[in-house]
Amino acid sequence: MTKQPEDWLDDVPGDDIEDEDDEIIWVSKSEIKRDAEELKRLGAEIVDLGKNALDKIPLDADLRAAIELAQRIKMEGRRRQLQLIGKMLRQRDVEPIRQALDKLKNRHNQQVVLFHKLENLRDRLIDQGDDAIAEVLNLWPDADRQQLRTLIRNAKKEKEGNKPPKSARQIFQYLRELAENEE
């Protein structure tokens, strides 16, 4: 009887494939159900959107048709349609959809933050004058320096005379127009 070499199993043809990258990731049934339920809630959020908001979310034709149908259906049929939408979402990459939905939800918050920044900039313009004008011109090169100076001068006079802050409101409006034109 001949003795087999010690590495005889390593020489099996077709066994050169490395199995290190082919790890099996075990996912519990409960986690799968939680993910499915979360996608169903995402689908329900999308169904509750209006037509204009729905246009801003990247959806393929089948999913869009299912969502539009769910918007027309009431009661038990709607629940089944939402389950179908959840199933369709499981078969797709939902990250772009989530990002678009978050962008729609956070639009108001972003606008409030922008208004606070513009109000602070307006107050600095009134308090600091030319130094703050340079900052505005760095942010928006097409801003009119002369118009800003005039508005700032008028705002300072109104503040000293305890008059209503008409020019301060005009400065804010001008800064808001500059910010909107930038977008």
Curated annotation (Swiss-Prot):
Family designation: Belongs to the DarP family.
Stated name of the protein: Dual-action ribosomal maturation protein DarP
Q: Which GO terms describe its molecular function?
A: ribosome binding; rRNA binding
Q: Name one GO cellular component term.
A: cytosol
- Organism, per UniProt? Shigella boydii serotype 18 (strain CDC 3083-94 / BS512)
For this protein, the parts annotated as crossing the membrane are none
Q: Name one Pfam family in it.
A: DarP
Q: Does the keyword section mention Cell membrane?
A: no
Keyword terms of this UniProt record: Cytoplasm, Ribosome biogenesis, RNA-binding, rRNA-binding
Q: Which gene encodes it?
A: darP
One biological process GO term for this chain? Answer: assembly of large subunit precursor of preribosome
Record HAMAP family: DarP
UniProt xrefs under PANTHER family: UPF0307 PROTEIN YJGA (PTHR38101:SF1)
Where is the protein situated, by its record's location annotation?
Answer: Cytoplasm
Record function comment? Member of a network of 50S ribosomal subunit biogenesis factors which assembles along the 30S-50S interface, preventing incorrect 23S rRNA structures from forming. Promotes peptidyl transferase center (PTC) maturation.
InterPro entries in the record: DarP (IPR006839), DarP_sf (IPR023153)
